[in-house]
């Protein structure tokens, strides 16, 4: 098999703007993925922790298990797993900022369990683990590597292994037509903007892709849970937070970066409300 090299440069260009800039619109968990508003009155922080619980509960974690978080971000999911599920954790990320931030954050949590954060891609990871969670990282993996990703994940899990994959989803033109979703030239321009300015190298899967590649690696898809309007609400809050911190954001970065992120957050909210984009959690079992 050809050796795969992680896309470090792409990931670092996306996430290594500055931790403080992201903290202006994210909640204290620093989760940069769709929240789960289990109750209408939830704060963003409560909804992000509810999202982590929603994902982790599907893994049937038991004390002492080892959980791998692929694309662990700023460590919010790892922290939740350590504090609420009493497991050993390994988080991997391609972002140096996220790696340093997560290491420092998790070092402050009292636990008898093993806690590791690595600057490493899934394609370099070969340790055996009991469970895998990946929230908002799959979008950067590229379709030509989907097969290898699911095969690697399957190989490092035990016979009763479980994996939770949380990813943004797209639809084919045919599906959008059937759903009555009309894609305008403005929508097409926004897609181009996202691909060039915000997530260079990103590629969104369709639900069918997850089924096809996961099942080809011998996973069973136990459950799919879509969270489309939860992401629209998350993005709405992020945009409001960033707008409220406009002066600080410009001081930290620039007016150009501030405007770029406002355009991105408001445009993505529109995509989720309109039905162009979706987001789902896929529970995979061996």
From Swiss-Prot:
GO CC terms in record: cytoplasm; plasma membrane
Subcellular location: Cytoplasm
This protein's UniProt keywords: Cytoplasm, Lipid metabolism, Methyltransferase, S-adenosyl-L-methionine, Transferase
This protein's record includes keyword Transferase: yes
Protein name: S-adenosylmethionine-dependent methyltransferase UmaA
Pfam families for the chain: CMAS (PF02353)
The protein's role, per its UniProt record: Methyltransferase that modifies short-chain fatty acids. In vitro, catalyzes the transfer of the methyl group from S-adenosyl-L-methionine (SAM) to the double bond of phospholipid-linked oleic acid to produce tuberculostearic acid (10-methylstearic-acid or TSA).
Gene3D superfamilies on file: Vaccinia Virus protein VP39
Lineage of origin: Bacteria, Bacillati, Actinomycetota, Actinomycetes, Mycobacteriales
EC number: 2.1.1.-
GO molecular function, one term: cyclopropane-fatty-acyl-phospholipid synthase activity
């Amino acid at each position: 098999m050809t050796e795969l090299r992680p896309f470090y440069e792409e990931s670092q260009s996306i996430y290594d703007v500055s931790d403080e800039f992201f903290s202006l619109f994210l909640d204290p968990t620093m989760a940069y993925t769709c929240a789960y508003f289990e109750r209408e009155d939830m704060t963003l922080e409560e909804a992000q922790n509810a999202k982590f619980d929603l994902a982790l509960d599907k893994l049937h974690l038991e004390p002492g298990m080892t959980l791998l978080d692929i694309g662990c971000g700023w460590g919010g999911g790892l922290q939740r797993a350590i504090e609420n599920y009493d497991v050993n954790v390994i988080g991997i990320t391609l972002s140096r900022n996220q790696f340093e931030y997560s290491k420092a954050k998790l070092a402050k949590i009292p636990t008898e369990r093993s806690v590791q954060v690595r600057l490493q891609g899934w394609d370099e990871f070969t340790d055996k683990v009991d469970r895998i969670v990946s929230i908002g990282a799959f979008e950067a993996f590229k379709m030509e590597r989907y097969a290898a990703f699911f095969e690697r994940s399957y190989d490092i899990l035990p016979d009763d292994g479980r994996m939770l994959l949380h990813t943004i989803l797209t639809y084919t033109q045919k599906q959008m037509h059937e759903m009555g979703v009309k894609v305008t030239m403005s929508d097409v321009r926004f897609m181009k903007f996202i691909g060039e300015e915000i997530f260079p190298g990103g590629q969104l899967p369709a639900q069918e892709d997850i089924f096809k590649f996961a099942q080809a690696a011998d996973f069973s898809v136990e459950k799919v849970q879509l969270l489309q309007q939860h992401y629209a609400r998350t993005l709405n809050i992020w945009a409001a937070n960033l707008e409220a911190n406009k002066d600080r954001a410009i001081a930290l970065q620039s007016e150009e970066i501030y405007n770029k992120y406002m355009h991105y957050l408001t445009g993505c909210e529109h995509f989720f409300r309109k039905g162009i984009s979706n987001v789902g959690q896929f529970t995979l079992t061996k």
